[in-house]
UniProtKB/Swiss-Prot annotation:
It is a multi-pass membrane protein. Residues 675-958 form the PPM-type phosphatase domain. The keyword Plastid does not apply. One of its GO terms (cellular component) is membrane. It comes from Dictyostelium discoideum (Social amoeba). In the C-terminal section; belongs to the PP2C family. Residues 312-361, 380-421, 445-475, 491-525, 619-659 are annotated as: Disordered. This is Probable protein phosphatase DDB_G0282105. Its EC number is 3.1.3.16. It is an enzyme of class 3 (hydrolase).
């Protein structure tokens, strides 16, 4: 471990040293230290030999030499000090100057030596002893030659020498200080170097740890990649399921839209039905008022009849009293009188109030109710009267009186009966006529089977009224009088004890179609000592067989006309077909039974099936009428179209003969952000964008008119660009395409005209569009995460514009799913191919490139298209997205070619190309403008619930 640490320290130190050696600052530092060392050596040299250079016995000449040497040393020291602060270039110059100064000094010394040799009278011997670091100059002067001048000069020189020594001492101190600073800085640098070495050691340890962690991270990254692949597979499966759910959702939204449309139609029809109902209600109310008036008149007649019957009964009682008197007077024959009294007692009871016996009331009934129930009891008078617990026996045949028996007594009432009968029959016939008219009117408006004959007998409502009266008071009712009019015999009805027997007897009697009112008057036996009589009027409603109960329209203003059961029944019958040209819409209408549920009366006799059948028959009749009118219109249109086609054929023949085509183009662009659809799709703003409108379009006509290209004119350039992840890429593409195609056409390497040498001009134009798309995509490298689809249409004419005979051509290139269609005659020609990631051919292309693709994959890195401009981040990953366009054939335009539709996928998600061509061609035949045609397609897209994207439409009329 120690060796490893030493090796690491040495390696770190060597690396640091090499790095310092390489740096320019370190080289300058080394140069400065070398110069400082040289200067220090020179100063030490002169300092050690100062006694030899500076002596008092030296001559002036020697002093001059010493001064020169000192000056040279001072200059050298000063120059060296300055050299430490300058750079390498200045140091080289100073070295050259030093060398030159040394040469000059040596020259001066030689010159002085020559002068001394010439001037000296006495010989002076200069000896040089070379010793390490010292030079001795021995001068021998003669004492005789010293003079005062020399002494003065020597003094001056000594002073100068002292000054120079002081300067040298100062410089030496400065150099010492500099050395101290250098020493301190060197120590600091060494300490820093040690710290750096320690840091390097720590960093190496950390580096080892990082290497280990990198290895671990690489292994984790590999695992994460595997997991990522699995997650992508799961994501693709989830996205496929999401697409399925979205398709279902779109289907449901289609159904919802159709349901809403049907609901609007139903509301309109319901409002019409309400208007009809209101008119019918008014008519019905008027007829009800008339019937009420008739009933009032009938009641008044019944009251008059009741009075007449009361008078008749009084007369009958008088006649009976007279007969009793006659019978009592005839006492001659006792046997006959006893038999007659017994029979009269059995037929007519005594009217004395002391006996408390009820008097049977003579009641006229119809022949239809002559068969009454009879109880097996005695025919005695006690059986008729009985007590409260005994049952009353029915009357025998002796109780019945024929009309011939009382012909003399009823002479007063017989003439009045036919009058009332005829009057009542008139009232009945008039009321039946009114009711029948009402039924016919309602059946005329609502259907022939609305009022159906009742299968069962009408239910009778019984009302009981108990009155305690005396036996002498005659008890009758209005209904009894009405029955008496239509009857021809008088019977006495038996009495019962309980109300249940009364109800059972009343319910057993059925009403015939001829009789309107029937009644049974029933007498109750006495209770206690007082005589009480209970009268129950069983009054049957006026109700003929085809008549239903009264219908009340009071709740027509309410919105809630359906209860839950009927609404479920109607919804179960509703079927909504998918979006199709030949779809059958079943209108959901509220039946009349639904309108009558909240009414005040019970309308159980009205069946829902009858009403549904009625509505269906009406709808079928309306549909048949509409179909007949449409067929007539279609026949007329077909005739007009045939005439137009004949004219067009003639014109086409003429145009084909002349080979002339209208060179002017009419076009229109319509676009919409479609915020509702985007909100429906839950889309949000892209980061950095202020709008959600990502569609951009161009329409340039005439294009390059000023350039005057050879053999080419009337060029039109039309394009739609649908951006994703923002509209930046679409904006760039819309600006780059016109510039790039202009460059390519001006280069001379591409041509749009026919070739006479047998070349393939279609291939030439395909090469033009391929290079155009590739150049634009290469200039969109900065759009890494943004992209767009592109659909570009070129329309041009061959030859110059002044030529009369010109042929026009059309060619389209696209990437993505913005489509274009050509309308030729009444047919649609698709000019583009949708490059979607879920397309089988695109999946096969990606597989052929060696890229794995799952069957459920519908997107490439979240993008729905497999070819686009931009998206260079995805393209660099090489996962299947390219920018190679689909190029259509070159189409020679003929007079049958009407227009071209270019639109983004927001339109094609709602309507297919064939339906769009059919929708717009009808407007084209009517002479509509391109603007109105584009507006029509835009509105159909935006109003659909399937539209969840921006919509851009270009119409080019050819």
């Amino acid at each position: 471990m120690v060796l490893m640490m030493d090796i690491k320290i040495m390696s770190a130190f060597s690396i640091l040293f090499l790095s310092l050696m390489v740096s320019n600052e370190f080289l300058e530092f080394l140069a400065n230290t070398v110069y400082a060392a040289i200067l220090f050596i020179i100063i030490l040299f002169f300092y050690q030999n100062r006694q030899h250079f500076f002596t008092t016995s030296s001559s002036s000449k020697d002093s001059l030499t010493s001064t020169t040497t000192t000056t040279t040393t001072t200059s050298i020291t000063s120059s060296l000090i300055q050299q430490q602060q300058e750079k390498e270039q200045q140091q080289q110059l100073e070295q050259q100057q030093q060398q030159q100064s040394i040469k000059l000094i040596t020259k001066e010394i030689t010159i002085e030596n020559d002068s001394e040799k010439n001037t000296s009278t006495t010989t002076s011997i200069i000896t040089k002893e070379q010793s390490p670091g010292s030079v001795r100059l021995i001068q021998n002067y003669s004492a005789s030659q010293q003079s005062e001048l020399t002494n003065t000069t020597i003094k001056q020189l000594q002073q100068k020498n002292q000054e120079l020594q002081e300067q040298i001492n100062n410089q030496i101190e400065k150099s010492r200080k500099d050395q101290l600073k250098y020493f301190n800085s060197n120590n600091k640098s060494q300490s820093e170097i040690k710290e750096q070495i320690e840091k390097i050691i720590k960093l190496t340890e950390k580096n080892d740890d990082l290497l280990n962690s990198i290895v671990i991270l690489n292994s984790t990254i590999d695992g994460n990649r595997i997991k990522m692949q699995e997650i992508t597979k799961d994501r693709d499966s989830i996205y496929s399921s999401e697409q399925k759910l979205l398709s279902r959702l779109t289907a449901f939204e289609k159904k919802e839209k159709e349901y809403q449309d049907n609901e609007k139609q139903l509301q309109k029809k319901l409002s019409d039905q309400k208007d009809q109902y209101s008119t019918l209600k008014k008519e019905f109310d008027e007829k009800v008022k008339k019937s009420n008036k008739l009933e009032n008149s009938i009641q008044s007649l019944e009251s008059q009849i009741q009075k007449l019957l009361q008078k008749q009964e009084k007369e009958k009682q008088k006649l009976e009293k007279d007969k009793e008197r006659e019978r009592s007077s005839s006492f001659s024959s006792d046997i006959s009188s006893s038999s007659t009294t017994s029979t009269t007692a059995s037929t007519f009871l005594s009217s004395s109030p002391s006996k408390s016996i009820p008097i049977p009331i003579p009641i006229k009934t119809s022949n239809a109710i002559s068969d009454l129930k009879r109880n097996n009891s005695n025919d005695s008078v006690n059986g008729l009267i009985g007590n409260g617990n005994s049952s009353v026996s029915p009357p025998s045949s002796s109780y019945l009186r024929e009309s011939s028996d009382d012909s003399d007594n009823q002479s007063s009432s017989s003439p009045s009966e036919p009058k009332f009968k005829s009057l009542f029959n008139k009232v009945k016939s008039e009321s039946s006529k009114i009711v029948n008219k009402a039924q016919k009117g309602i059946n005329k408006h609502l259907g022939s089977d609305f009022f159906t004959p009742a299968n069962t007998t009408t239910s009778t409502t019984t009302t009981t009224s108990t009155t305690s009266t005396s036996t002498t008071t005659p008890i009758t009712s209005a209904s009894a009088t009405a029955a008496a009019i239509s009857s021809s015999s008088i019977i006495t009805s038996p009495t019962t004890n309980t109300t249940n027997d009364i109800l059972s007897s009343s319910s057993s009697s059925s009403s015939s179609s001829s009789s309107l009112l029937t009644t049974n008057a029933i007498l109750s036996p006495p209770v206690g000592n007082e005589q009480q009589m209970e009268v129950i009027n069983d009054k049957t409603e006026v109700n003929q067989s085809p008549v239903k109960p009264l219908i009340f329209f009071d709740d027509l203003g309410n919105d809630k006309l359906l209860d839950s059961t009927t609404e479920e029944q109607i919804q179960s019958k509703m079927t909504i077909s998918p979006r199709d040209k030949d779809r059958i819409l079943i209108d959901k209408e509220q039946s009349l039974s639904d309108l009558f549920i909240n009414s005040k009366e019970n309308i159980s006799n009205i069946s829902v099936s009858n009403l549904d059948n009625f509505l269906k028959t009406n709808n079928n009749n309306n549909k048949n009428n509409i179909e007949e009118s449409n067929n007539n219109n279609n026949n007329n249109n077909n005739n007009n179209n045939n005439n137009n086609n004949n004219n067009n054929n003639n014109n086409n023949n003429n145009k084909n003969d002349n080979k002339e085509v209208n060179s002017k183009l009419e076009f229109s662009i319509k676009d919409e952000e479609n915020k509702i659809g985007l909100r429906r799709a839950k889309k949000k703003l892209s980061p950095g964008c202020s709008t959600m409108m990502e569609d951009v379009s161009i329409a340039i006509y005439p294009f390059l008119k000023e350039k005057k290209l050879s053999n080419c004119s009337n060029i039109g350039l039309f394009g739609v660009f649908d951006g994703h992840a923002g509209r930046g890429a679409a904006d760039s593409a819309s600006k780059l395409f016109p510039k790039e195609i202009e460059k390519l056409l001006e280069s001379g390497n591409y041509s749009l005209t026919e070739q006479d040498d047998g070349g393939d001009n279609n291939h030439n134009q395909s090469k033009l569009l391929n290079d155009l798309f590739s150049n634009v995509d290469n200039k969109m490298k900065d759009h890494e995460y943004e992209g767009c689809t592109a659909t570009l249409a070129l329309i041009w004419s061959d030859g110059e514009e002044q030529q009369q005979q010109q042929q026009r051509y059309l060619q389209v290139g696209n990437v993505g799913d913005s489509s274009a269609f050509l309308c030729r005659g009444n047919e649609s020609i698709e000019l583009t191919f949708d490059h979607k990631a879920n397309d089988p051919s695109e999946k096969q292309r990606i597989k052929d490139q060696g890229i794995p693709v799952s069957d459920n994959q519908t997107r490439i890195n979240g993008v729905a298209v497999s070819r686009s401009l931009g998206n260079h981040f995805i393209k660099e990953q090489n996962i299947g997205m390219i920018s190679t366009p689909h190029i259509s054939n070159r189409y020679l335009l003929t007079p049958q070619d009407k227009f071209v539709i270019i639109a983004s996928d927001g339109l094609w998600d709602v309507i297919n190309g064939k339906d769009a061509i059919e929708k717009v061609s009808s407007l084209y035949d009517q002479g509509a403008t391109a603007d109105s045609m584009a507006s029509c397609l835009l509105e159909t897209a935006i109003q659909s619930s399937l539209c969840k994207d921006n919509v851009t439409v270009i119409i080019v009329k050819l």
